[in-house]
Amino acid sequence: MRVGVLGAKGKVGATMVSAVESAADLTLSAEVDAGDPLSTLTETNTEAVIDFTHPDVVMGNLEFLIFNGIHAVVGTTGFTAERVEQVQSWLAKKPSTAVLIAPNFAIGAVLSMHFAKQAAPFFDSAEIIELHHPQKADAPSGTATRTAKLIAEAREGLAPNPDATSTSLPGARGADVDGIPVHAVRLAGLVAHQEVLFGTQGETLTIRHDSLDRTSFVPGVLLAVRRVRERPGLTIGIEPLLNLQ
């Protein structure tokens, strides 16, 4: 398969360039970064693209890719419900094209979200702390937002988090994502980390994942690239590829 990388000069993008070059069954067809024309992808007969760019440009990238029939594996964050609906609308006009958007491609991170969903109904309280490098554009992270939504779904019909806080500074209790408090840390020296904290009478449970290097994303991204065209339309997350439903 001929694979292009968008955001090829970024830290994650450069890692993906090396990963594609090292994969015996993939051919690196294009390296595209800010200022380079997207037409490079069509001129090089690129079949699938890995996008690790920026929330400000990812929608324009996807519109181009979908209408040119190029499959996309997207690690760029910042996808609101409205953006997802727009992508689905574009894909409806190109039913054979596939887009996979994942908040996290690290296998351990995906498993931690799955474990959190399983644990959620058994605890009274749940909160999330996500920790990233200070260059990250969005807060809370896509992984934390998705984790919170999964926890909220698993706790549907149960009592909300107990919390007697009556006065606080703005933001002190974190962002509220479907009733789950999410706290974002931006600190030099970090890459990507998340803790999910559960509590109930007499015990707590912490599920933590740490990406210590951006190569942690490579196995998940390459899995998605190899299988994206099997799933025309929109796929959210790599859970279906890991049989985690």
Curated annotation (Swiss-Prot):
It holds the Pfam family DapB_C. (S)-2,3,4,5-tetrahydrodipicolinate binds at H133, G142, T143. It catalyses: (S)-2,3,4,5-tetrahydrodipicolinate + NAD(+) + H2O = (2S,4S)-4-hydroxy-2,3,4,5-tetrahydrodipicolinate + NADH + H(+); (S)-2,3,4,5-tetrahydrodipicolinate + NADP(+) + H2O = (2S,4S)-4-hydroxy-2,3,4,5-tetrahydrodipicolinate + NADPH + H(+). Pathway: Amino-acid biosynthesis; L-lysine biosynthesis via DAP pathway; (S)-tetrahydrodipicolinate from L-aspartate: step 4/4. NAD(+) binds at G7, A8, K9, G10, K11, V12, G75, T76, T77, A102, P103, N104, F105. One of its GO terms (biological process) is diaminopimelate biosynthetic process. The active site is at H132 (proton donor/acceptor), K136 (proton donor). It comes from the Bacteria. Its EC number is 1.17.1.8. Keywords: Amino-acid biosynthesis, Cytoplasm, Diaminopimelate biosynthesis, Lysine biosynthesis, NAD, NADP, Oxidoreductase. SUPFAM superfamilies: Glyceraldehyde-3-phosphate dehydrogenase-like, C-terminal domain (SSF55347), NAD(P)-binding Rossmann-fold domains (SSF51735). The keyword NAD applies. One of its GO terms (cellular component) is cytosol. Catalyzes the conversion of 4-hydroxy-tetrahydrodipicolinate (HTPA) to tetrahydrodipicolinate. Belongs to the DapB family. This is 4-hydroxy-tetrahydrodipicolinate reductase. The gene is dapB.
